[in-house]
């Protein structure tokens, strides 16, 4: 049978030969051609009406005939003259790139399953075509010169050749062969099935200009367009090749609708179309909306008032509640009970600073002191009578002047108070009349107190039963002498000052607390 020339047989066929009809065309798109090196099945060619739930395959019908028959199916090019294609059919009953089998005599309709397409590489095209000629797989007897032309490796057609027995001639009579519609490789972008997968929105203004993001299967940026159509009206989406992203996404702007004065929304069809072969995708619905005339809602914004805004904020479920009160920081307050006794002036006490004195005085207890260098338990005010101190407190004007100048607290009049209670308090008055004190005397006093021998000599003088604590400088003695008299209504400062400072007979006092005062700060404030 391979030695027959089909053109001679077809030309000599009688007019009563039954025709062959393709009643189920192969599906044009959706199938992928497989290379032989992939090592897997090439699949099965589906029918045109095949779905996921109902599978169909290419089907033919031999009209006006029912009986034994033989069929050969091969691959040819889509353009006329149909040349043998270098690709091969693979599957059951396939050899040398074509399918051949006996048909059942009990029926006239025949369906073909398990037919796959196996593609060849470009460098193997010439060898594959030469093999078709050697195996007499050239249904249209194309000349060798025409076989050297280029081949479209992404498109093939099925050629059905049916043979029935001729009882008179004793041979197989070929029936007129038929060629199916093209089958495209789904892997190639220029022949693949067009499909819109998703869009970011499916409505826009009738004036056009809305930006749409469209996701699709692989397309070629130079061979694709987006079509909007309704009846006889058609318009293309506006985009350039740069707006096609990696062959799977297109960003375009919608065209204006044919009637920009519509008062109701209009639904149109949106499709992908390939200009090279006029292939289109399944349509997707797009809705044109009437023009509102105010795209930025300026008129609506002008109508908004402050009351409307407050009402909106109040009813908004995401609106915040009442304004939070200002956050307050808790600060610890030291509540010191104030004394009801009248406030008496005292010596200024500076703010505590780091002392630079090179010595540290020991803590002495009055009841355990037996050596001559210990402190006296009490100091009588009569000891200071020889110094010429006045018993009168300073006048109110002098007291106010001292308080405004030094801002140091005074000691209360209680002679038994501790030195801790003599620290500055908020409501205590200040002693501020030390302007006559010579700063050099304080410096001398500070230098003299640094030696323990001098301190011991100052604590007690030999030959006296009640000595003074130390020899006061001349300027301090002069200040004490110039105090107002007690007859003027003032209070005595000597008793509260001296006894409050040196009364250590009743409780334990640290001697070092007096010398740790920062005299440098005091001197700098009085300058």
Swiss-Prot record:
Keywords: Activator, Cytoplasm, DNA-binding, Nucleus, Phosphoprotein, Transcription, Transcription regulation. The modification Phosphoserine is found at residue 276. The keyword Thylakoid does not apply. Residues 494-527 are annotated as: Transcriptional activation domain 2. A motif (Nuclear localization signal) lies at residues 301-304. The keyword Hydrolase does not apply. GO terms for biological process: canonical NF-kappaB signal transduction; cellular response to hydrogen peroxide; cellular response to lipopolysaccharide; cellular response to tumor necrosis factor; inflammatory response; innate immune response; negative regulation of apoptotic process; non-canonical NF-kappaB signal transduction. Its main location: nucleus. Signal peptide: none annotated. Residues 18-306 form the RHD domain. Coiled coil: none annotated. Residues 381-444 are annotated as: Transcriptional activation domain 1. SMART domains: IPT (SM00429). InterPro entries: Ig-like_fold, Ig_E-set, IPT_dom, IPT_NFkappaB, NFkB/Dor, p53-like_TF_DNA-bd_sf, RelA_RHD_N, RHD_CS. SUPFAM superfamilies: E set domains, p53-like transcription factors. GO terms for cellular component: cytoplasm; NF-kappaB p50/p65 complex; nucleus. A motif (9aaTAD) lies at residues 513-521. The transcriptional activation domain 1/TA1 and the transcriptional activation domain 2/TA2 have direct transcriptional activation properties. The 9aaTAD motif found within the transcriptional activation domain 2 is a conserved motif present in a large number of transcription factors that is required for their transcriptional transactivation activity. NF-kappa-B is a pleiotropic transcription factor present in almost all cell types and is the endpoint of a series of signal transduction events that are initiated by a vast array of stimuli related to many biological processes such as inflammation, immunity, differentiation, cell growth, tumorigenesis and apoptosis. NF-kappa-B is a homo- or heterodimeric complex formed by the Rel-like domain-containing proteins. This is Putative transcription factor p65 homolog. It comes from Xenopus laevis (African clawed frog). The gene is rela.
């Amino acid at each position: 049978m391979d030695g027959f020339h089909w053109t001679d047989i077809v030309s000599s066929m009688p007019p009563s030969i039954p025709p062959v009809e393709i009643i189920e065309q192969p599906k044009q798109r959706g199938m992928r051609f497989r290379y032989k090196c992939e090592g897997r099945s090439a699949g099965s060619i589906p029918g045109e009406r095949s779905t996921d739930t109902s599978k169909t395959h290419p089907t033919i019908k031999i009209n006006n005939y029912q009986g034994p028959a033989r069929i050969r199916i091969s691959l040819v090019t889509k353009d006329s003259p149909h040349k043998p294609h270098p690709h091969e059919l693979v599957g059951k009953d396939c050899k040398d790139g074509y399918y051949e089998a006996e048909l059942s005599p009990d029926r006239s309709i025949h369906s073909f399953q398990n037919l796959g397409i196996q593609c060849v590489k470009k460098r193997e095209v010439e060898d594959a075509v030469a093999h078709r000629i050697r195996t007499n797989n050239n249904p249209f007897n194309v000349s060798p010169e025409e076989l050297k032309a280029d081949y479209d490796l992404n498109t093939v057609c099925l050629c059905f050749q049916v043979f029935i027995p001729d009882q008179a001639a004793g041979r197989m009579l070929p029936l007129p062969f038929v060629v199916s519609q093209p089958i495209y490789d789904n892997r190639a972008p220029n022949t693949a099935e067009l499909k819109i997968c998703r869009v970011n929105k499916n409505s826009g203004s009738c004036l056009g200009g809305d930006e749409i993001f469209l996701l699709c299967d692989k397309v070629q940026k130079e061979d694709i367009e987006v079509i909007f159509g309704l009846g006889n009206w058609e318009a293309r989406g506006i985009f350039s090749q740069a707006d096609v992203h990696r062959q799977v996404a297109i960003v375009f702007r919608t065209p204006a609708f044919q009637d920009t004065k519509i008062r109701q929304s209009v639904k149109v069809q949106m499709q992908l179309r390939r200009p090279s072969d006029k292939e289109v995708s399944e349509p997707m619905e797009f809705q044109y909306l009437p023009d509102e005339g105010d795209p930025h809602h300026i008129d609506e914004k002008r109508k908004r008032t402050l009351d409307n805004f407050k009402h909106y904020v109040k009813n908004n479920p995401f609106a915040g509640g009442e304004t939070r009160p200002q956050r307050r920081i808790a600060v610890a307050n030291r509540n010191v009970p104030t004394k009801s006794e009248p406030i008496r002036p005292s010596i200024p006490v500076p703010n505590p600073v780091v002392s630079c004195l090179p010595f540290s005085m020991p803590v002495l207890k009055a009841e355990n002191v037996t050596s001559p260098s210990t402190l006296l338990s009490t100091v009588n005010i009569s000891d200071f009578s020889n110094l010429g101190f006045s018993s009168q407190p300073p006048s109110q004007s002098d007291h106010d002047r001292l308080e405004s100048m030094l801002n140091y607290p005074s000691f209360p009049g209680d002679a038994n108070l501790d030195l801790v209670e003599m620290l500055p308090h908020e409501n205590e008055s200040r002693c501020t009349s030390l302007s006559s004190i010579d700063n050099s005397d304080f410096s001398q006093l500070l230098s003299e107190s640094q030696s323990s021998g001098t301190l011991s000599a100052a604590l007690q003088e030999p030959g006296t039963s009640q000595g003074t604590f130390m020899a006061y400088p001349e300027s301090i003695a002069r200040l004490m002498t110039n105090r107002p008299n007690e007859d003027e209504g003032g209070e005595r400062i000597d008793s509260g000052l001296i006894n409050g400072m040196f009364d250590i007979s009743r409780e334990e006092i640290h001697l070092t607390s007096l010398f740790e005062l920062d005299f440098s700060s005091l001197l700098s404030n009085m300058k």
